[in-house]
From Swiss-Prot:
SUPFAM superfamilies: Photosystem II antenna protein-like (SSF161077)
GO CC terms, sorted: photosystem I; photosystem II; plasma membrane-derived thylakoid membrane
BP-aspect Gene Ontology terms: photosynthetic electron transport chain
Keyword Kinase: no
Subcellular location: Cellular thylakoid membrane
Miscellaneous comment text of the record: This low-light-adapted strain contains 7 pcb genes.
Biological classification of the source: Bacteria, Bacillati, Cyanobacteriota, Cyanophyceae, Synechococcales
Record protein name field: Divinyl chlorophyll a/b light-harvesting protein PcbB
Transmembrane segments: 27-47, 89-109, 142-162, 203-223, 243-263, 307-327
Pfam families registered for this protein in UniProt: PSII
Keywords: Chlorophyll, Chromophore, Membrane, Photosynthesis, Photosystem I, Photosystem II, Thylakoid, Transmembrane, Transmembrane helix
Subunit structure: The antenna complex consists of divinyl chlorophylls (a and b) and divinyl chlorophyll a/b binding proteins and binds more divinyl chlorophyll b than does the antenna complex from high-light-adapted Prochlorococcus.
Main location class: membrane
The keyword Transmembrane helix is annotated on this UniProt entry: yes
Length: 352
């Protein structure tokens, strides 16, 4: 974390990142616990939505988030946009709750029973392999490689699910199996207009390509190291906990903004049966998405409206967080801003 040259800086209890910044074991514990919290939310909220789901009302008009995504994956025996077999959704929700407990227990175990610093383990041991320093590009790229491989495997799982189980096709109005279209020309051409994609085969082809690309990239990052000396030209002095946090916030913010625009207008991936009609982008004090369905009651909103607007504003603030932490990582002291305003208030003009 940025300390501005103060070696004995202290942090308040709510500065959670400070507790893991220089302790790789605690960092893993926080990762596991965080993943457990996300899985707990997904499982608990799915059960909550199932309890209040009304099959007589369009799913997109019930302010649901989890169930529309499960329905889009062809789960729930969907007929005419209605869940007819909620058992599958219940199983998935309960599994998420169970795994959230496992991950939470793992976080507690790593935090209380195992060493807070993986560097204290013997050389050659598996924990030692994942010990890292924020300014060590070789170890960071080694860990990045493992992340990329897991993302690639997740893409493979999605592609195989669509190919053998099937996902919802809004054009057909039914769940069907989808084979991936691995046309590299199509993938290249959709770089700029992927928000307008209308073919599920193309969607799966993009995920299949990503799976291959991420796994190859992951293997590359695991087995390779810096070529030559690590110099300032290559970025020496720029890597730090704060810098990596800023990169992460930028990535999450970008993904959130893409999700906002994609979910607001695309009906191939976000079907109208589950998310409601497409939205219109408007500008006031800030940009926002509005519903276009005239049948909605006053003050009511579709799941698409909630999804797009929440992602848009979260993405916006994530980008602001990226800029904040990136500037701090570069050495900018925001305390100077307050001092500048104080100096302006205390400044006096004298007549010579």
């Amino acid at each position: 974390m940025q300390t501005y040259g103060n070696p004995s800086v202290t942090y308040d209890w709510y500065a959670g990142n400070s507790g893991t910044a220089n302790r790789s074991g605690k960092f893993i514990a926080a990762h596991a616990a965080h993943a457990g919290l996300m899985m707990f939310w997904a499982g608990a909220f799915t059960l909550f939505e199932l309890a209040r789901y009304d099959s007589s009302v369009a799913m997109g008009n019930q302010n649901l988030i989890c169930l529309p995504h499960l329905a889009q994956l062809g789960i729930g025996g969907i007929e005419n946009g209605v869940i007819t077999e909620p058992y599958g959704c219940t199983v998935i929700a309960v599994l998420h709750l169970i795994f959230s407990g496992v991950l939470g227990a793992g976080g507690i175990l790593h935090s209380t029973r195992y060493d807070g610093d993986l560097g204290n383990y013997p050389e050659g041991s598996r924990p030692k392999k994942f010990d890292f320093e924020w300014d060590d590009p070789d170890k960071l790229t080694f860990i990045l490689g493992h992340h990329l491989i897991f993302l690639g495997l997740a893409n493979i799982q999605f592609v195989e699910w669509a190919q053998y189980h099937g996902i919802w096709d809004t054009a057909l109005g039914a769940t069907r199996t989808v084979s991936y279209n691995l046309d590299l020309g199509m993938i290249w051409n959709h770089q700029a207009d992927f928000l307008q994609i209308t073919s599920l085969e193309d969607v799966m082809g993009g995920h299949a390509f990503l799976a291959f690309f991420q796994i190859i990239g992951g293997a590359f990052h695991i087995i390779t190291k810096q070529f030559g000396e690590y110099t300032e030209f290559k970025g020496k002095g720029l890597l730090s906990a704060e810098a990596v946090l800023s990169y992460s916030l930028a990535g999450v913010g970008y993904c959130a903004l893409v999700a906002a625009f994609w979910s607001s207008t695309n009906t191939t991936v976000y079907s109208t049966e589950f998310f409601g009609e497409v939205l219109q982008l408007k500008f006031d004090f800030a940009p926002y998405f509005v519903d276009t369905d005239p049948s909605l009651a006053a003050g009511a909103h579709t799941a698409r409206a909630w999804l797009a607007n929440v992602h848009f504003y979260l993405g916006f603030f994530f980008i602001q967080g990226h800029l904040w932490h990136a500037l701090r990582a570069m050495g900018f002291d925001f305390r100077r801003v307050g001092k500048a305003f104080d100096n302006m208030e205390n400044a006096k003009i004298t007549n010579g």
